C-alpha cells in the first residue's frame, strides 16, 4: 500500500502534494527542473473564455512573510489553453486540476462545459474567490446564495468533478462552504488570498497599481488552518488545503486540521523544487511522528 496515497473525487493522488494554481503556470517551465510525474496533482493556471491581459503594473509586491499580487487572471483564453497548454500536460500521468474563472455565470459555464475535453483534466477548481478582479470573482465567493447558484450551474455541465475555491475575505466561511456543498460540489479548495495593501513612502500611494492585492505566503497560514478546521468540523466534503505552506510540518498541520491534500503556492517562486522536496520529506517526518499512513491519519482525525 502507498502510505501517501489519497483518493478524492476524480483524483487518485500518489501523494498529497501539488502546486497551487497561479504559481505554476501550465507546468512547462517547471518541467525543466524535475519530472512532473512526481507530483500528486497539478493545479493549472486560471482559464477564462477569452484572453485576458490582467491588471496594470506594478502588480506584485513583497511583504514581510509573504507577497501581494494583483495579476488579474492574465491568461491566453480557453481556445489557446485547449490547443496548446493542456496537450503538453497530457504526456504526464499526474492528474490536472483546471482552474476556471470568469466575470459572469455564463463565463464559468462556457469554460467548465469544455475544459474536460482534455484527457489530462481530471477535475475543475472553480475560482470564485479571486480578490483582484473588479467584475465578478469576489462577488461570487462572498454570497452563499450566489455561490450555490453558480456551483449548481457548473455542475450541470461539467464532465469532471468540481472543487470550489473559497475566499477567506468573508465573515462566515462555514455558511459559504455549506451552500456550495448543498449545490453538489465534489470538494473545496481553501483558502485563496487575503486582501492586503502596501504603501510606497515616497509616492504616498499604494505600491500595487490596482490599489489592493491578494496576500499569500506564510503570513496567512494560521488563517488557512483555522478556516479548514472550521469547515471540517461541520462537513466531510473533500478539502485541498493551501495558504502559506513552506515546510513538511506545514503539510502535516494542514492534514491534521482537516485537509485531504495540500497545495503549495508562493514558495514555488522562491524554490522551484519545493514540491518534490516536500514529497521526499513527508514519509520521513511521518515516521518521526509515528504516523503510519495518511489513511490512518484521516481515520484518527475522524475519531477525534
From Swiss-Prot:
Substrate binds at residues 45, 69-73, 127, 192-193. It is found in: Cytoplasm. Keywords: Cytoplasm, Flavoprotein, FMN, NAD, Oxidoreductase, Pyrimidine biosynthesis. Binds 1 FMN per subunit. It comes from the Bacteria. Its cofactor is FMN. CDD domains: DHOD_1B_like. GO terms for cellular component: cytoplasm. GO terms for biological process: 'de novo' pyrimidine nucleobase biosynthetic process; 'de novo' UMP biosynthetic process. Pfam families: DHO_dh (PF01180). Its EC number is 1.3.1.14. GO terms for molecular function: dihydroorotate dehydrogenase (NAD+) activity. It is an enzyme of class 1 (oxidoreductase). The active site is at 130 (nucleophile). Pathway: Pyrimidine metabolism; UMP biosynthesis via de novo pathway; orotate from (S)-dihydroorotate (NAD(+) route): step 1/1. The keyword Nucleotide-binding does not apply. The keyword Zinc does not apply. FMN binds at residues 21, 45-46, 99, 127, 165, 191, 217, 243-244, 265-266. It catalyses: (S)-dihydroorotate + NAD(+) = orotate + NADH + H(+). InterPro entries: Aldolase_TIM, DHO_dehydrogenase, DHOD_1B, Dihydroorotate_DH_1, Dihydroorotate_DH_1_2, Dihydroorotate_DH_cat, Dihydroorotate_DH_CS, Dihydroorotate_DH_I. Belongs to the dihydroorotate dehydrogenase family. Type 1 subfamily. Heterotetramer of 2 PyrK and 2 PyrD type B subunits. Catalyzes the conversion of dihydroorotate to orotate with NAD(+) as electron acceptor. NCBIfam families: PRK07259.1, pyrD_sub1_fam. This is Dihydroorotate dehydrogenase B (NAD(+)), catalytic subunit. It comes from Listeria welshimeri serovar 6b (strain ATCC 35897 / DSM 20650 / CCUG 15529 / CIP 8149 / NCTC 11857 / SLCC 5334 / V8). The gene is pyrD.
